[in-house]
């Protein structure tokens, strides 16, 4: 008699994805982040569901409902801070996952990579709308500034912004629709993640060497389940420490002030995980140019597979490309720092140089370096 997990219509799908899936023997802990992201999404959906039971999406009561959750609901404070800091963990895992893909050449699985880019955009949209919901000062002004960027689109821009706002300013209609979309999008993200996984299992996982490993595979369970559980424990430890010891470390104090349309905060800035893109946006003096640069800073990921000029897939044996990769990482950290600083000298020029560096490294220097490495290896 065949094993039930191999014959049952539903169980065999789970079995082929999580139990008997052949996985390269050489993959390292950098391959843990997919499962960590699914864990983050599960935490976010669960905590979000419990928060939605007590939250009211009305401008008059939204701020007070969040206060009520933290003060009066049993363990409301921990649910709220798990949700807020869970988003930060989500983006840390997301950026490390993308970095891994860039370093080891996983972007050559184009369908998986493109679905991943869609997932990134969906996650960013969800996080942005979630930041608006507590209806603090930074929520209101962040929503006003970021949605207003769409007015840079020629001809239809102003109408588009008013259509999104549901009026002539960010108000009750905006908050209600943002809550609706913020609730809906995580389920779309979960569906996209399934498609992401489906395409990945069509090709099989990449590995650190970048060399096909069809002859050297091991089953996912128990080897990688144990490895993933270790990563999960480490991530949950960090998240717990963040939530229990300094829950407001990554937040903005301005968001503890109720939204006031008549009083602009001194420095309007998004959450830390958007600061690199915000710095690129601010580094261009022209509004439309800034918006284009902002979108392209993420959309540039879609171009990377076409810029792969190396004869080797992974950067594991390419020291010059490795140096460039870590320069790019440092550049992104500099942009993140600049995004949180006021618009004044010397931050303006540092932001502009870092923005130019970001696009130049990806579009010009990396492909040329790969060609040089091919030449040095006489390929």
UniProtKB/Swiss-Prot annotation:
Key word Protein transport present: no
Transmembrane parts of this sequence: 33-53, 77-98, 113-133, 178-198, 226-246, 288-308, 320-340, 347-367
Gene Ontology CC: one annotated term: respiratory chain complex III
Cell location: Mitochondrion inner membrane
Main location: mitochondrion
Domain of life: Eukaryota
Keyword field: Electron transport, Heme, Iron, Membrane, Metal-binding, Mitochondrion, Mitochondrion inner membrane, Respiratory chain, Transmembrane, Transmembrane helix, Transport, Ubiquinone
Keyword Glycoprotein belongs to the record: no
Cofactor names: heme b
UniProt GO molecular function: metal ion binding; ubiquinol-cytochrome-c reductase activity
Note: Heme 1 (or BL or b562) is low-potential and absorbs at about 562 nm, and heme 2 (or BH or b566) is high-potential and absorbs at about 566 nm.
Function: Component of the ubiquinol-cytochrome c reductase complex (complex III or cytochrome b-c1 complex) that is part of the mitochondrial respiratory chain. The b-c1 complex mediates electron transfer from ubiquinol to cytochrome c. Contributes to the generation of a proton gradient across the mitochondrial membrane that is then used for ATP synthesis.
Quaternary structure (record): The cytochrome bc1 complex contains 11 subunits: 3 respiratory subunits (MT-CYB, CYC1 and UQCRFS1), 2 core proteins (UQCRC1 and UQCRC2) and 6 low-molecular weight proteins (UQCRH/QCR6, UQCRB/QCR7, UQCRQ/QCR8, UQCR10/QCR9, UQCR11/QCR10 and a cleavage product of UQCRFS1). This cytochrome bc1 complex then forms a dimer.
Name this polypeptide is given: Cytochrome b
Organism: Noctilio albiventris
Lineage: Eukaryota, Metazoa, Chordata, Craniata, Vertebrata
């Amino acid at each position: 008699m065949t094993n039930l997990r191999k014959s049952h219509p539903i169980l065999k799908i789970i079995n082929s994805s999580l139990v008997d899936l052949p996985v390269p023997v050489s993959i390292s802990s950098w391959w843990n982040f997919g499962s960590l992201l699914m864990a983050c999404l599960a935490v976010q959906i669960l905590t979000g569901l419990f928060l939605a039971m007590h939250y009211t999406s009305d401008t008059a009561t939204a701020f007070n409902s969040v206060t009520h959750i933290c003060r009066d609901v049993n363990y409301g404070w921990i649910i709220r801070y798990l949700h807020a800091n869970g988003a930060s963990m989500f983006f840390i895992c997301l950026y490390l996952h993308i970095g891994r893909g860039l370093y080891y050449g996983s972007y050559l699985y184009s369908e998986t990579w493109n679905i991943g880019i869609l997932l990134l955009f969906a996650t960013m949209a969800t996080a942005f709308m979630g930041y608006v919901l507590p209806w603090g000062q930074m929520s209101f002004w962040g929503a006003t500034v970021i949605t207003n960027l769409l007015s840079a689109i020629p001809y239809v821009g102003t109408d588009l912004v008013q259509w999104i706002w549901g009026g002539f300013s960010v108000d009750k209609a905006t908050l209600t629709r943002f809550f609706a979309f913020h609730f809906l999008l995580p389920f779309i993200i979960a569906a996209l993640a399934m498609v992401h996984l489906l395409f990945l299992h069509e090709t099989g996982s990449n590995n650190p060497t970048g060399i096909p490993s069809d002859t050297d595979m091991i089953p996912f369970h128990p080897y990688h389940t144990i490895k993933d559980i270790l990563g999960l424990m480490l991530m949950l430890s960090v998240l717990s420490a963040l939530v229990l010891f300094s829950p407001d470390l990554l937040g903005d104090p301005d968001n503890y002030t109720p939204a006031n349309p008549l009083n602009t905060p001194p420095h309007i800035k998004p959450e830390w995980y958007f600061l690199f893109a915000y710095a690129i946006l601010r580094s261009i003096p022209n509004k439309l140019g800034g918006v284009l640069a902002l979108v392209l800073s993420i959309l540039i990921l879609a171009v990377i597979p076409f810029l792969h000029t190396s004869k080797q897939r992974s950067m594991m044996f390419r020291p010059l490309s490795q140096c460039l990769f870590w320069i790019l990482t440092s550049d992104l950290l500099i942009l993140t720092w600049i995004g949180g600083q006021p618009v004044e000298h010397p931050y303006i020029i540092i932001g502009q140089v870092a923005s130019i560096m970001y696009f130049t490294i990806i579009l010009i220097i990396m492909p040329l370096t790969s060609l040089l490495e091919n030449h040095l290896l006489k390929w």
